[in-house]
């Protein structure tokens, strides 16, 4: 008991909120899901709520004589990168699976967002036998322009992987997304669920049979934007873990075992999936009491010990205001992803009355929940500069985000094309963006808790789908009134 009290005392100052009341988590949850409408590519439906967006990318895939319309633009540009898009989809699906009962009416909005992605991913997987399409748009040209997706005139180059040009990382992540989504739709659309799962199995087999990194196959088309820096074995473990959860087929358990133990990371992101796989597999050890997965439970707890402040093995920095700080570029992507894992592992711990040790300190579920809550509250405005890093949440939020469509006149107000360079006049102005991308979470503050709110500062001012996707689960947890 002494070690537990000492551990809690040591980092209690980090967990104490500076605010007098909790943020409105239900509002934040709703807006975090609404954000995805602003990232849509393809023909927009009548129910589109973010009305300053219009249909775009309607010829995507035509360069390869296939239909690759739909999906999401990853961040503030007009390119569809499937590796982060599939990860976004997996995390949205995991959120719905773990926290759907706590989402209330927002669960249907989550399903809509998931399906917008999976409809596109199904096209990518099924359009051409022996190929998996993994992206649309030339990032090197796109990033030289500042134009709306509705009238972009940059090349819509199509990228794919195959047996001769493998991409196990993007293939296994696509399989993970489809498998996870198949469980989301199992009870509400069984036919669609079966299609998702059947396709997930095929794509996962492709990833296993033809191993290699998509960065090697596609080089400058995906690097340095979304290089697979961690390699592809983490995605193989992650993808197989999701197929195992969706099917309970021992084939996937045996394949996971054949991969070995994997790395011991202190991060979780669209690139490095090991920590996510460990937490997902630890579910079987804890909830199903399956001793075959004990090593992954231990790996998950080793990861958490690297995150918790004042843990003997902690390798995570925190700002003075209490925010996890991993890397300078888009730090909040790591904060939201890690926070999801903390909240979810705490959920498993509570269900089984489980505790574990970081050195001599006994870790209880509420230690993880308290740290998660501190990160969520910080993002929503409980921080030294009282800035909400979610656009449109509270009165003080980023006004000049690095996002083409948000920063330029809407297509409804100015239908004439701006051209590749026509938007830079808006880019360089200090005026707030004319279109509010409600719910978008930007890259976040610097290590000193500061945020300059400059449009050209993409490291801090650019939103991304995967930042939001991982935030949905923790928001749903706290929106349901779970503060401990």
Curated annotation (Swiss-Prot):
PROSITE patterns: GH9_1, GH9_2, GH9_3. One of its GO terms (molecular function) is cellulase activity. It is an enzyme of class 3 (hydrolase). Its EC number is 3.2.1.4. SUPFAM superfamilies: Six-hairpin glycosidases. The active site is at residues 77, 402, 453, 462. Specifically expressed in root cap cells. It comes from the Eukaryota. Residues 1-21 form the signal peptide. Belongs to the glycosyl hydrolase 9 (cellulase E) family. This is Endoglucanase 9.
